[in-house]
């Protein structure tokens, strides 16, 4: 099977990227760094902690990497997660923990929004961030 990176397509005008590749999210994003830096799209990822571990990375590493690219993190369930998400995503039951002690499921449907755009969210995201 032949694969290509996002960057290999040479896209120059991308507003939204959805990635749901059963644990391979880290590698898809790594292959799209130029696209992310040039286009600054909103990115939707489904992250499942056990799938991440299969590929030797942790969900919070991916989240931290996106924050380093100056993206804010938004959850459909919990709104903005800046400074809130602290899960190590290591436990066998794939549970994470929030600062306030609430447990969460191991799967996360997250939106990464460029910091410069977070006050002008696309309409489909405004439903999730109240």
Describe the residue ranges of each PLM region.
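Conserved acidic-Pro-Pro-aromatic motif
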Residues: 7-129
